[in-house]
Amino acid sequence: MFYSFVSLPEGKMSTRKGVVVYLDDLIDEAIARAYEEVKTRRTDLSEEKMREIARIIGVGAIRFNVIRVQPEKQFVFTWKEALNFDGNSGPFLQYSHARACSMIRKAGEFKRSADASKLTDESEIRLAKVLAKFPDIIESAAEDRRVHLLPSYGHEVASAFNQFYAAVPVLSAKDCRDERITLVDCTRIVLRNVLRCLGMGAPEEM
């Protein structure tokens, strides 16, 4: 699949004018910037682990930032967008996946439950509905060659999940703990599959 021109904030790239960014340099810069972010956020991690996570984030940030745009459209590449942990970006999806993994680890044993009648909060219902769209999104992306649907859907899942996380207690829930943890686990699985389909790593901690 071919993509249109990618520009920099300074303007369009041009080999004639010497305004060129090589992919290897772009990847190295992405990893370096991701490393600084990880080092700030996770001082508890070993140097080796921080660099491992930084590589996953850096490479994924570039892939996501390109794939999220329709192939026929030009776009301007900026580090602020590509490495934004809270926006429409690869790191946001990866961070949401890592958060779900962390919650599952902390939950310990739980009984998988599909009793949707216990999920009555608006944030729970919205997340469940978004997750249910995954098979249709995959089919449309494959059949119509609309790969940009996957990053858009992944962002929708991550946003719904973080709203759910902020709205209701999960690990400390009483009558619906199993149902909510099951919803978290379903989110983890869907985000992992979206990331893998995009050729991105799915870190379990960030």
Task: Specify the residue positions occupied by each region the protein language model found.
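Non-catalytic interaction-recognition regions
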Residues: 1-206
